Amino acid sequence: MAAQKSSVAVIGGGIMGGDIAIIFAAGGWNVHAMSPSQKTRDALPARIAAGLKKLGAPEVNAANARTHATLPTLPWKDIGLVVEAATEELPLKQKLFSEIEALARPEIPLASNTSNFPIGEIGRALKHRSRVAGLHFFMPAHLVPLVEVVSAEFTDPRVAESLVTLMKTLGKAPIWVKKDIPGFVGNRLQHAMLREALYLIADGVVSPEGVDTAVRYGFGFRFIACGPILQKEMSGWDTNALVGTALYPHLYSTPDYPAAVKAMVDKGYLGMKTKRGFWEWTDESI
């Protein structure tokens, strides 16, 4: 059930689907992107060409991308991998996977780019669930190296391993998430930090500017060189154990989203999109 370099079906041509199409086109794959939206299909060729140029990939590869309005029109006998990147609606994804299973060759991997739903729920009703896995890219997908390959309880490990290998050949930095947990790994790490930051702001400990400064010019400054585990390997786990033992009881662990931020959202203060969030924004500052 390994994905063989040939043709990839990208289901959904929106922001994520378009970026995923760019990744595979840059890698020399034939790309078949399906979207029911005529507007999306019309825009996709130019978007892929622009993405290839930004990546420094051969622009002639854009000619290997095709768009389709419906699933049955894809050349399924040639498709070696399916990546679903449709709207984040669970019933829609389940319906798509059911239709794809009836069309795709039985030996090819079927992957979902979902960031919200368990892979197990997306593929639970399929007859051949062992070939279903998560392939979670981060926006902008063609520029951000990280990809999470997610195994559900029924995913064949060989499928996950083949996707990890494939992502490496496409120049990505994949990790294998071996349990189908909410948020996978990247989003859990981001939100763990964000929860602490928002509560520190809500409790008047520090300003929003102070939080961003602490991250950008403190520990975040080192992250491009090494992650948190390697950093502690370097500084010593004995030191970390002492600090963590003293500090962890004081960290925010509530499951509730901060009321102060909820109130801000209720007022319509959503950030740049509404010209006000923690800060006020103008067209010039944006």
Where are these regions (language model features)?
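NAD(P)+-binding Rossmann beta1-loop-alpha1 motif at the extreme N-terminus of oxidoreductases
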Residues: 1-54
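NAD(P)-dependent Rossmann-like dehydrogenase/reductase catalytic/cofactor-binding core
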Residues: 2-4, 27, 169-175, 179, ...
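Acidic/polar active-site rim loop that often engages polyanionic ligands
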Residues: 26-29, 140-150, 224-226, 245
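Hydrophobic/aromatic beta-strand patches that form the interior of the parallel beta-sheet core
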Residues: 32, 68, 83, 133-135, ...
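Structural/interface elements that position substrates and couple domains in central-metabolism enzymes
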Residues: 32, 169, 186, 190-196, ...
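Rossmann-like dinucleotide-binding cores of NAD(P)H-dependent redox enzymes
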Residues: 33-60, 151-159, 174, 182-189
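Rossmann-like NAD(P)-binding element
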Residues: 39-43, 53-109, 117
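Rossmann-fold dinucleotide-binding core
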Residues: 109-183, 187-188
